[in-house]
Amino acid sequence: MRAAHDEVVREHGRITNMKRTLLHSPPAFHALMEWYALRDTVQPFLGERLVSLFSHAISTENDCLVCSTFFRQIITESGEDPDRFKLDEREEAVVEFGRRLAKPFARVPNELFARLAATFSDEQIVALTAFGALMVATNVFNNALDVDLDGYLDPYRKDEATPAKGTA
């Protein structure tokens, strides 16, 4: 466990409450940390901004305080308002796809899939879907264990968001 802890600090600079909780089970930690590998796969064709907007859409739809606030921070620090950002058609399709992945049964209407298929290859859509699925899994993990929001994220909390009160 110590080696995994040191690796997180080396790669990500800090141990968040979520990562600290995940480190109780190294296989669980490694499974959810594949999020980073998938992010690195989709970022070249989405761009940093759309990766954050996609992840924020999923996390907001799932009402995950930890993840939605994390992405609110990224969006805010990039100079945008996380509650009022402008999207072009491509971005709109990707953000809507994220919201759909977060809904029960993750059904994606044919029309939305056609919009994605017009822009992305099959390989890219598969990577985007897997990335979104890991984002959903991360949301479920944080919500199920009521992982506390990290203090550094408090200023980015959405006004009506209630503090997490878990012990994890």
Question: In which residue ranges do the predicted regions lie?
Answer:
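Hydrophobic alpha-helical segments
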Residues: 1-168
